[in-house]
Curated annotation (Swiss-Prot):
Its main location: membrane. HAMAP family: NDH1_NuoA. The lineage of its organism: Bacteria, Pseudomonadati, Pseudomonadota, Betaproteobacteria, Burkholderiales. It catalyses: a quinone + NADH + 5 H(+)(in) = a quinol + NAD(+) + 4 H(+)(out). This is NADH-quinone oxidoreductase subunit A.
Amino acid sequence: MNLDQYLPVLLFILVGIGVGVVPLLLGYVLGPNRPDPAKNSPYECGFEAFEDARMKFDVRYYLVAILFILFDLEIAFLFPWAVTLQEVGVTGFVAVLVFLAILVVGFAYEWKKGALNWE
């Protein structure tokens, strides 16, 4: 197995990592670090913080976000299939129907469990 052909790829990856990491390290090493009470104090729109910034966040927002990502990815997988519909034939069509059936069953399950109700 000849690995010489992968040397440019390895070099490209190393240069890319170096371009990202070297400026960060230089800024950390060469940058001034003089903390004082004004810099370490919490700042909120020009005023001192009124209360603790950590507040409870409703879990339903996370659930909606996860469901959005799930069904958004479904659409992202359907676009390439729609473009190559003529080439994939009946086998590709059946595969996408199975994919959509699984997602519809999952959506119906979420609906039945009440995950989409905001009450």
